[in-house]
Amino acid sequence: RYNVDESIPHLNSSWRQKICLWSFSVVDHFDLSRDVVAVSMSLFDRFLATRGNRCNGSTARLASLAVLHIAIKVNEVQRIKLGTLANFSRGQFGPRDIEEMEWNVLTSLDWKIHPPTSMSFVSHLLLLLPPQIDDACKEEIYSLSRYITELSFCESAFVETNPSSVAFAAILISLED
């Protein structure tokens, strides 16, 4: 399991991967859709971009809590209390800290918090497969494409890649297998 309070000495691909894996562990713990992580990481990346991609480890950890909470509220019926989420910081942040960071994120992004995700593109693109392909095969393509897109969330090299391009590439790779 990954904890949000792990050391993030400087913002690079390893900190992003830790935040992404931690986010997956939280959504898995609460049995939420893994698509929440795609939205959360998009919010995180766009928030950092408004700050010139400059952020210390503490701010990155707090922002990761805030964007995950926003993504859960926007995409899930189930709610996670701020106090519960704050517990994942092992006392480093309280509910009020997360709430203030949420406001900071929302205003920085002009409330544009529902980005298209690579998984939504995968779902739509798979509808274009020929009807001759059986459902079991389509499900296999979907599962592998989903896995590939989830890997892309954790990789900083894909931050500036359009979600539709990631989805298309994931499907092409899935079709090769």
Predicted regions and their residues:
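Extended serine/threonine-enriched, polar tracts that run as long, contiguous segments within proteins
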Residues: 143-177
